[in-house]
C-alpha cells in the first residue's frame, strides 16, 4: 500500500516534512567487521539524516560496544562536532567491570563540561552480544546509576533470548521503575510479549528497528500497545532511514500515529535533558 495522506505526500514530493521531524532513537557509528557500510562515518551519517529529515540521532559507537574505553571516546568526539544533531548512549560492557565503573564515574567528573546531557542521554546494553543477561549482577551498577538519574536505557532485546528476552526485561522494569527503558527491536518476534510489557510498565517504550521489515507488525503494535509508546529507530548505518520512513508512511496507521512515532514521543523523552529548544 502506498501512503496517500497529506504527510505521506509531503515526504514523497519533498523527501522530508518540516511539520514532522524525525528523531532516530537507535543508531550506531563507524565501520563493522565483515560488512561494508557506504555511509558509516560521522559526516556521511549527517548527510543521510539531512536527506530524509532526521533532526537528531541517538547512537552508540560500534567500537564502544566491544571496547568501551576507546569507542565511548569516539562517541564524545562525534557529539561535540555536531551538538545540534547527535546525542549518544554510553555503551556498557559488563565483561569489563573496571571500564564500566570508570565510564559511570566520568559522567559526573566535570561539572563545567557535563557529559550528561551535553553528550550522553543514557546507556546502551547489548546483552545478547556480550553473553551476559540484563539481570546479571555485573549490570547492577549501570542499572542503579540509570535509575537514580532517570536516564534512558536502550537495551537490545530479542524474542527467545535468555539474555534480553521479555521475561528478563520484565524483571528489570520492575526493579528499576525510574529508568526510561527503550526496548531495541521490541523483543523481536515475541510481539505479544512486547505489547504486554508496554501495557504493564509506563517506563517502557518499543523501539522499531527491524520491526519495519515484518509486514503487519507495526500496525499490530500501534493497535495493541498504542502509538504513544513507539519510537522510530533504524540502526543507522545498518539500515537506511528512507526504508524505515517508507514503511512507516505506507503502513495502515494514521498521521497522528506517525507524528507520535517520528517525533512526539521522542520529544517527550528528551525534554528533561534538552528542553527541546533549538533541538
Report the location of each language-model feature:
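Conserved, mostly hydrophobic/aromatic
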Residues: 26, 49, 75, 123, ...
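Acidic/histidine-rich helix-loop elements
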Residues: 28-40
